Structures are given as structure tokens and as C-alpha cells.
């Protein structure tokens, strides 16, 4: 189902960005690896990976506090790219490693640059077709009058 939706959107020139939270109780190392593979397989254009972050006054914060799984109360660590709780199915160090793995694997090599180049070409082509494209003239004076 997701594959078909992604394909339909991409066929209409719409880029797909996935926002992925890593570290949920259902995830382990293998789950995260399969998730990254799936995103690449279905042709997601961009992905943003974050680590589950139990911010104050959130339900997940209350749950993790109740379970004694909060590892840090230093708010400078609450950046969505650092593990500040004890994951259920892996060590905090393994989750941190999987976070880096997700970014590096999704954006490895030149594939990302090629995808962004293709996306940019589609945008320009569409703007040219509908008359909204304006070429930037470097010789034209710009400024306030």
C-alpha cells in the first residue's frame, strides 16, 4: 500500500520526505536496518531520522519515568540526535549507532545527489511548462529604490 502511494505521488512530480523516529519500544537493530532498506526500495526522496526524545510533559516522558528508563535530565542532551533513555530492545549505545547507520546508509554515495538533481529538474520543467519559471539575470541591477 505504501509503495503504491509513494509511486503515485512521485509520478505526479511530488517529492516524498520521510520523518522517522528511531528507538520506539518495537524497534531493534534489525528492524531499523529493514526500515532504511525499505525507504530506499520504495524511492523516498529524502529522510530525516531522529531519536525518540522524551520531552517534558509528554506522555512518553511520563511512561519512561514511571519505568525508570530516563538516563539524562540534562536538557542540553535533548536534541533528537542523542539517546537520553534506555531503549527496550537494544542498548543506548546500539541505538545511537543505528541512528548514524540510518543517516549514512540512506545518504551514502552519490545516490542522494542524483535524486535531488532529478527532483530539481522536475521542478524547473514544471515551472517552465506552467509559465512560472523566471531565469535569474545576473546583469540586472537589484536593490531598493
PLM regions: where:
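Short, amphipathic C-terminal "tail helix"
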Residues: 123-145
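A structural motif corresponding to the C-terminal lobe/cap of the Radical SAM core domain
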Residues: 1-127
Amino acid at each position: 500500500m505504501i509503495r503504491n502511494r509513494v509511486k503515485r505521488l512521485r509520478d505526479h512530480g511530488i517529492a516524498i520526505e520521510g520523518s522517522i523516529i528511531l528507538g520506539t519500544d518495537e524497534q531493534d537493530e534489525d528492524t531499523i536496518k529493514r526500515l532504511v532498506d525499505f525507504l530506499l526500495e520504495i524511492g523516498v526522496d529524502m529522510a530525516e531520522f531522529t531519536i525518540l526524545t522524551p520531552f517534558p510533559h509528554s506522555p512518553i516522558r511520563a511512561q519512561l519515568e514511571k519505568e525508570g528508563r530516563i538516563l539524562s535530565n540534562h536538557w542540553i542532551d535533548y536534541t533528537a540526535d542523542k539517546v537520553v533513555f534506555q531503549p527496550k530492545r537494544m542498548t543506548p549505545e546500539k541505538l545511537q549507532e543505528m541512528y548514524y547507520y540510518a543517516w549514512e546508509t540512506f545518504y551514502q554515495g552519490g545516490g542522494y545527489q542524483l535524486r535531488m538533481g532529478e527532483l530539481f529538474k522536475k521542478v524547473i520543467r514544471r515551472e517552465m511548462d506552467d509559465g512560472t519559471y523566471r531565469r535569474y539575470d545576473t546583469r540586472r541591477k537589484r536593490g531598493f529604490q
